[in-house]
Amino acid sequence: MHATVDRATVTAWAKQAQSTLEKAQTLCTNAQTSLHATSYQLTSHLPDLLEEANVLYESLKTQHELLAKISESLRRSIRDQLLNTLEKQQSTLLQPALNNLDDIVGHLSATIVPSFLIEKDEAENRTLADFISTDSINLLRRNIQIYTNNHEKIRQLLNNKLQDVILSPFHEIGSKKFNKTVKLYEEITPLQLKLKAITSNIAPLDSSNVVATLLKENAALENELVSILEMLTNHYDQCTQGVQILYSGGSQQVNLEILKNDAQELPDVLKELHTVYDIIVNNEARAQKFINAHSPSIEVVIATMKDQLSFYRSFKSKNIPEIMVLFTVCEEILMKSPIEDPGGPEQTPIEKFTDTVNQLVYHYTQFLNVFKSQYLRELHHEQFSYPRKFLSKLTNFLNDELYKMQIEEKERRRAWLTKYGDFIPKEFRLPGEYNQPVITQVVTEGLEDVQKEGADAERHITQEKELLELLRKMEELNRERRY
């Protein structure tokens, strides 16, 4: 031990070491607090914000895809499967059928029926349209008009509601805002990649990764703090030990030279510690600046996504049920047919109306065709042709075959009496001319028209001419329609 170093000097070194150690411990405590704050901000707070953003983003994507499918399904169900289907049926089925009905009724109205064709005598001619149920047709038309008017009102109501309640809100708020939110979320993706790189050994850290740089620097600074604190603690322990040895007069040797050198270096060590502390505090400020630069954008993304999810929840709980209830009610109204027929529930009212109209068209078309091509010809045959033929046959028979047979029979009987009559007693019934069958009167039915005379005969001839002229016109019309 050097004689120049007394107990007072060593004691002063010990006090200096204690004071320096206490200052160092305070600085290290503050530095550790700063390190923990920086670490929390960079490895906990910021990642938690990003994780919250990730969770919200995944939920947002799921809800958006779900509501997009529901919105499209509602659009197809309401517009394509119900409204457009009924509208197409109306334009391609019902309207052509009504046009055909108008056409055939027009033909019936244009087809004159001479008064002599009617059982009851009438002064004026009528048309075929006078013999169809126009009241029933008009009632059917009114029912169709009522249905189509209601269909148009419901179509406008459903279309407007679908647009206002589902399509427009989802497009403006759901889709447009969703796309903007996605862009905002994509802006924080580079930060996520930087944080992911810190916990991944897949690729070396980028020198531009501020978070990684700060954490790496702070880890080195923390090690330096520990090293300095250990050195100061060790120096203090040695000084304390030296004081104890000097005061106790023990024989244990103390390297006072080392203590002296260490004591002289304490201000520099403390200065170095302050420098490390300042760097740590500065890193905390840098970290806070980094957080302040990025947290607002992350929080904006989170707030935007929460707002978007709130819209989606409201959309699911209010808008969708509203349109579905309206759709169900309107569909029941549109599919309820005023016509009770065996068409079955699978047929729409428009299809049932169309079937009914087509049946009328078929019946009236047959009515017109039969009248033009069958009835007039058959009527002429039964009223004129056949009676004449029958009368001709009857006249020929009476005046030819039957008359000849009567003459032959009369001559035969006369010859027989001449030859055999004298041999038969007069008390016997003798054959002769007195009981020969003869026609004294011919009674016929259905030949009155062809047997008329005078004015009646002239009128009958006129009717036949009119009938033949009408038949000719009908046949010409049939040929024109064929060609």
From Swiss-Prot:
Can you supply one Gene Ontology CC term for this chain's record? Atg1/ULK1 kinase complex
What's in the keyword line of the UniProt record? Autophagy, Coiled coil, Cytoplasm, Membrane
Q: Which residues form a coiled coil?
A: 136-161, 206-235, 446-483
User: Which Cys pairs are S-S linked?
Assistant: none
Membrane topology label = Peripheral membrane protein
Designated name of the protein = Autophagy-related protein 17
Function per UniProt: Autophagy-specific protein that functions in response to autophagy-inducing signals as a scaffold to recruit other ATG proteins to organize pre-autophagosomal structure (PAS) formation. Modulates the timing and magnitude of the autophagy response, such as the size of the sequestering vesicles. Plays particularly a role in pexophagy and nucleophagy.
The compartments listed are: Cytoplasm; Preautophagosomal structure membrane
The keyword RNA-binding is annotated on this UniProt entry: no
Family of this protein: Belongs to the ATG17 family.
Q: Which gene encodes it?
A: ATG17
GO terms (molecular function) for this protein are: molecular adaptor activity; protein kinase activator activity
Q: Which organism is it from?
A: Scheffersomyces stipitis (strain ATCC 58785 / CBS 6054 / NBRC 10063 / NRRL Y-11545)
Q: Choose any GO biological process term that the UniProt entry carries and state it.
A: autophagosome assembly
Asked if the record carries the keyword Cytoplasm, the reply is yes
The protein's predominant localisation is cytoplasm
Q: Which domain of life is it from?
A: Eukaryota
